[in-house]
A protein has these predicted regions:
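Active-site "cap" helix and flanking loop/linker of ATP-utilizing ligase/carboxylase catalytic domains
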Residues: 1-18, 34-108
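Short beta-strand elements
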Residues: 19-23, 28-37, 115
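Residues in well-ordered beta-strands of folded domains
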Residues: 20-22, 81, 98, 110-115, ...
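Generic long, charged, amphipathic alpha-helical segments
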Residues: 93-132
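Generic C-terminus detector
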Residues: 117-120, 124-178
């Protein structure tokens, strides 16, 4: 419907269209649309894509998506975001981050930087959402466990993270069951 509305306004939109939604008892509600990939949503989807992303985006720009077949890895993916204490409110910056190398050395784990910076040769926090840790696994539970295991290897003062990512799925509850 959104793309149809853009077309009705004379806009020939081609590219990423990220929708932010919230599940409510009345059903899903739109929070926002962005003309970019969503973060961390993309960080859990793209590791499963076997195709060259550049080729996919060029096909999109040239209205040729119907000429390619997306090929996906069979693995499950889970991403966990590491945040600074206080996020989404006020938070401190400049906290030294350690353990990323250990997490990145784990098979099927990728660490994505968001709110980080290098100061005096040290990697430090520089935002509320600091890192996203994505893991792939042959089952959802294995991917989730691997992601949390990798998160344990990373440390910085004030590190916070949600411990409930994927629990509804593990407990057999529908994600829409709010």
């Amino acid at each position: 419907q959104t793309v149809a509305e853009l077309a009705a306004e004379g806009i020939d939109y081609r590219g990423c269209l990220y929708g932010g939604f919230m599940l409510t008892p009345a059903g899903p509600k739109v929070l926002e649309f962005n003309a970019r990939f969503g973060d961390p949503e993309t960080q859990v989807v793209l590791p499963r894509l076997k195709n060259d992303l550049v080729e996919v985006m060029l096909a999109c720009a040239n209205c040729e998506l119907d000429q390619i077949e997306l090929d996906w890895r069979d693995e499950w993916a889970v991403a966990v975001v590491l945040t600074s204490a206080g996020y989404p409110g006020s938070y401190e910056k400049g906290k030294v981050i350690t353990g990323i190398e250990d997490a990145e050395a784990m098979e099927n784990v990728t660490v994505y930087h968001a709110g980080t910076a290098v100061v005096d040769g040290q990697l430090v926090t520089n935002g509320g959402r600091v890192l996203a840790v994505t893991a792939l696994g042959d089952t959802f539970e294995n991917a989730r466990n691997l992601a949390y295991e990798a998160c344990e290897k990373i440390d910085f003062e004030g590190k916070t993270l949600r411990h409930d990512i994927g629990l509804r799925a593990l407990r057999g509850r529908d994600a829409w069951d709010v």
